[in-house]
């Protein structure tokens, strides 16, 4: 019996380009959706741009355009990127739409009527220059716990403490640089604790990934809190009904964007929207998301739906991040690759296949090893799969005018291939794509071994063996057809070219039906080898792209420095004695390695040589040094006798000295030539 399903991907933020990290999720979901279509299920695949929030408002102002213009350009670019990677959305919409405004307003009113919206007056930091309340991430200052400078308003990335923005020492607006003032404002809250019982039951249903269920249990033990769903003007978003100058927080209307995109599709095609969203719906609803937004999709979103008497997701499928060559994607190394840059140089099916070969049902990071990428694509797709067709098709075309044999040369081998159909289907269903690919490639090896053992090139030279030659080559093409059917969800373009060659549609239902006695088209090249020079071209273009951006930012920074040269410096600190100073053991250290801490916006991780030993130091100077690997080999000055400090991202065994006001305005101290690691500063 056919299943009815609705599938979504997390909404890309309309404030930047799509990159290969985004593509992991969209390729994963698209493979799953295409498989379900091949199985005959009624499935709809929707997404949208997440188009609201303070960052979009500020970025638009910075560019001298309206937020509407900014998000329209982003949507055009995003749609082009997804199309380039053959992501088969039935609809791609925007959260800044009439459908989303209507549904968001309706759901808010329903939650309010059901008693799940609370209000209270809160105190917030306010930028007197920009006349706007400042979100936590738009306030910076000194950490109240460890006194680290240039920390965000909600947590310290040096000591991992959390706090209120008003606890910051010397806070400043990240928008204008002004010193914020405290103002009161009425805010609206979603009463999440009221849904704890429902959420616990949903967690125990067994349908969620174990990692998500375990994480939810931690959140339950910590205690659920009411969720602030309002923001004060100015803000780019939807206004809250009956509340002057109040807007819905972007994370309230973002998941509702799933519904809005589907509603837009329903209005255009006549689909029944309520059938998929009513509380007793018998359809299935799946969300593919990254591990960084599990909190919103496993707590707030199902609670909101339940509070509005709507159905909850059947499941939420989370995935990990993409690393390149074992480390976080890097702009300076050229591995923070935008989708549009990739598409200029490399076939999108290469990445689809590589991701599929490594994706499983767990929340694990996936490493894009560039050397392995080239080797696997060429080995599996070109040398094994496509070569299987080409080495047999030439004989069928030249000797038999494209006509296949009337019977299978090896029925047992064909039956073995068909017998794997349900196991491969189960792997696809369970999102264990790596297992599906492994099994398909095992079959591909068997198919090529069959051809090697039969050696049609030898048979072709023997008198009176035409029937045997036709039978062997037809068998090879038949096995290629089965393999391409199994790979169609992963490689839709290659499958389309294979269908043109085979003169038949590849479906799951006809896998077991051989093309006996039928004609195939003249063989044309199905797939090109992936060359290292293509990878190099992507890397170099990515480096150039971000180098140009850094140059523009550096130019602005220099102008800013020139404009502030005459500003007052910080006052001299209180006097100390020579004995106080003598307590510090300052040493010269050589940078052995330096890399960004992936989870932190501030920290660089240094490995330092002090002559007789090495130290690891975490330093909050990321904003000042965009290319940390360029620091390797430099000499720095460090406080060597500072007690080791266990931080959120590891242990720091000292402090590197720098000068400046903080943020991008920091400069490492260095020394003259001739110094050696371990020398004491006196």
From Swiss-Prot:
Residues engaged in binding Zn(2+): 143, 146, 156, 159
Subcellular localization, as worded in the UniProt entry: Cytoplasm
Family: Belongs to the class-I aminoacyl-tRNA synthetase family. MetG type 1 subfamily.
Subunit structure: Homodimer.
UniProt-listed InterPro entries: aa-tRNA-synth_I_CS, Anticodon_Met, Met-tRNA-synth_bsu_C, Met-tRNA_ligase_1, Met-tRNA_synth, Methionyl/Leucyl_tRNA_Synth, MetRS_core, MetRS_Zn
Keywords (A to Z) from UniProt: Aminoacyl-tRNA synthetase, ATP-binding, Cytoplasm, Ligase, Metal-binding, Nucleotide-binding, Protein biosynthesis, RNA-binding, tRNA-binding, Zinc
One GO molecular-function entry: tRNA binding
Chain ranges for the short sequence motif 'KMSKS' region as given in the UniProt record: 328-332
EC number of the protein: 6.1.1.10
Species lineage: Bacteria, Pseudomonadati, Pseudomonadota, Gammaproteobacteria, Pasteurellales
Species this protein is from: Actinobacillus pleuropneumoniae serotype 7 (strain AP76)
SUPFAM superfamilies named among the record's database cross-references: Anticodon-binding domain of a subclass of class I aminoacyl-tRNA synthetases, Methionyl-tRNA synthetase (MetRS), Zn-domain, Nucleic acid-binding proteins, Nucleotidylyl transferase
Reactions catalysed, as given in the entry: tRNA(Met) + L-methionine + ATP = L-methionyl-tRNA(Met) + AMP + diphosphate
Intervals of motif 'HIGH' region: 12-22
Leading EC class: ligase
Function as written in the Swiss-Prot or TrEMBL entry: Is required not only for elongation of protein synthesis but also for the initiation of all mRNA translation through initiator tRNA(fMet) aminoacylation.
HAMAP family linked to this entry: Met_tRNA_synth_type1 (MF_00098)
Protein name: Methionine--tRNA ligase
Entry-linked PROSITE patterns: AA_TRNA_LIGASE_I, TRBD
Gene Ontology biological-process entries: methionyl-tRNA aminoacylation
């Amino acid at each position: 019996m056919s299943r009815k399903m609705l599938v979504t991907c997390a909404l890309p933020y309309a404030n930047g380009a799509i990159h290969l990290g985004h593509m992991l999720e969209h390729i994963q979901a698209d493979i799953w959706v295409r498989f379900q279509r091949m199985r005959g299920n009624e499935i709809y695949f929707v997404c949208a741009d997440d188009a609201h929030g303070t960052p979009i408002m500020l970025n638009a102002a910075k560019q001298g355009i309206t937020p509407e213009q900014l998000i329209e350009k982003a949507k055009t670019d995003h749609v082009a990127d997804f199309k380039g990677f053959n992501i088969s959305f039935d609809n791609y919409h925007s959260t800044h739409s009439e459908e989303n405004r209507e549904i968001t307003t309706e759901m808010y009113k329903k939650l309010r009527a059901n008693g799940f919206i609370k209000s209270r007056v809160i105190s917030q930091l306010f930028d007197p220059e920009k006349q706007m309340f400042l979100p936590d991430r738009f306030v910076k200052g000194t950490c109240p716990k460890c006194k680290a400078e240039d920390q965000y308003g909600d947590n310290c990335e040096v000591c991992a403490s959390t706090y209120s923005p008003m606890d910051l020492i010397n806070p400043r607006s990240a928008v204008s640089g002004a010193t914020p003032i405290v103002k009161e404002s009425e805010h609206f809250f979603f009463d999440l604790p009221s849904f704890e019982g429902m959420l616990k039951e949903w967690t125990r249903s067994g349908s969620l990934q174990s990692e998500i269920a375990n994480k939810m249990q931690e959140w339950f033990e910590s205690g659920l809190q009411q969720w602030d769903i309002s923001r004060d003007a100015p803000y780019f978003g939807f206004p809250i009904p009956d509340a002057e100058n109040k807007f819905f927080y972007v994370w309230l209307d973002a998941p509702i964007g799933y519904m809005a995109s589907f509603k837009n599709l329903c209005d255009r095609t006549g689909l029944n929207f309520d059938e998929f969203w009513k509380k007793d719906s018998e359809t299935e609803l799946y969300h593919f998301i990254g591990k960084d937004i599990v909190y919103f999709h496993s707590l707030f979103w199902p609670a909101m739906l339940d509070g509005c008497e709507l159905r909850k997701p059947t499941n939420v499928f989370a995935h990990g991040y993409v690393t390149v060559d074992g480390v976080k994607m890097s702009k300076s190394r050229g591995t923070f690759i935008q989708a549009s840059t990739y598409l200029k140089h490399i076939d999108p099916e290469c990445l689809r296949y590589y991701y599929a070969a490594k994706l499983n049902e767990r929340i694990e990071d996936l490493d894009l090893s560039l050397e392995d990428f080239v080797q696997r694509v060429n080995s599996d797709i070109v040398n094994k799969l496509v070569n299987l067709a080409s080495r047999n098709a030439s004989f069928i075309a030249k000797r038999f005018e494209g006509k296949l044999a009337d019977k299978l040369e090896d029925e047992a081998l064909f039956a073995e291939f068909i017998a794997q159909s349900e196991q491969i289907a189960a792997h696809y269903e369970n999102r264990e794509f790596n297992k599906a690919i492994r099994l398909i490639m095992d079959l591909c090896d068997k198919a090529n071994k069959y051809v090697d053992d039969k050696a049609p090139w030898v048979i072709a030279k023997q008198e009176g063996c035409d029937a045997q030659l036709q039978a062997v080559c037809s068998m090879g093409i038949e096995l290629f057809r089965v393999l391409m059917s199994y790979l169609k969800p992963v490689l839709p373009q290659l499958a389309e070219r294979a269908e043109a060659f085979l003169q038949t549609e590849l479906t799951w239902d006809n896998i077991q039906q051989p093309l006996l006695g039928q004609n195939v088209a003249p063989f044309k090249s199905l797939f090109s080898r992936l060359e290292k020079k293509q990878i190099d071209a992507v890397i170099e273009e990515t480096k150039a792209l971000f180098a140009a951006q850094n140059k523009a930012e550096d130019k602005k920074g220099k102008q800013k420095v020139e404009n502030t040269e005459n500003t007052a410096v910080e006052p001299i600190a209180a006097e100390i004695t020579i004995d106080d100073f003598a307590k510090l053991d300052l040493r010269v250290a050589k940078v052995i390695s330096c890399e960004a801490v992936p989870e932190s916006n501030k920290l660089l991780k240094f490995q330092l040589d002090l002559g007789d030993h090495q130290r690891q130091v975490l330093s909050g100077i990321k904003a000042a040094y965009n290319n940390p690997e360029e620091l390797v080999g430099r000499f720095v000055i460090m406080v060597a006798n500072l007690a080791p400090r266990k931080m959120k991202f590891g242990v720091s065994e000292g402090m590197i000295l720098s000068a400046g006001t903080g943020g991008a305005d920091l400069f490492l101290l260095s020394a003259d030539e001739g110094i050696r690691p371990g020398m004491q500063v006196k």
